[in-house]
């Protein structure tokens, strides 16, 4: 029997951080048809503070990857708070990963793998891996 995403979260002992409040005039989530669009998320820690730093200057690529994973946990917390039920999510369709990095940093796909690997672990290989863009923001 296939495990539900909520069961996988418990099995791999993940803790979701608090869902952040909107920092401007936007909806954290919008449902259109059978698609759920989620506004940009940051890497919120369990204590509610943000992970900060620029990859290639303050953070290594590996630390950036951990921050991208934390963005995934923050996104799941936002879904749970506003949508109530993570198990209603059927698949990841598209990921736009934006890496706060130096101009010289080029390992954006490696960093965003932190997010993608988490989604795969929660939703499974078939449904947790979608289309993806990984870009750097300086």
PLM ranges: what are they?
Residues 1-138:
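Short, polar/acidic, helix-capping and beta-turn segments at strand->helix junctions
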């Amino acid at each position: 029997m296939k495990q539900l995403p909520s069961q996988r979260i418990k099995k791999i002992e993940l803790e979701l951080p608090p869902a952040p409040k909107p920092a401007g005039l936007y909806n954290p989530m919008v449902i259109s048809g059978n698609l759920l669009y989620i506004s940009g998320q940051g890497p919120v820690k369990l204590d509610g503070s943000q992970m900060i730093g620029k990859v290639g200057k303050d953070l290594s690529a590996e630390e950036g990857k951990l921050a991208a994973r934390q963005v995934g946990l923050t996104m799941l917390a936002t879904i749970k708070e506003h949508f109530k039920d993570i198990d209603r999510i059927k698949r990841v369709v598209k990921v736009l990963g934006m890496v706060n990095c130096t101009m010289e940093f080029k390992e954006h796909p490696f960093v965003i793998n932190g997010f993608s690997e988490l989604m795969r672990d929660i939703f499974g290989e078939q449904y947790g891996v979608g289309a993806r863009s990984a870009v750097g923001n300086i």
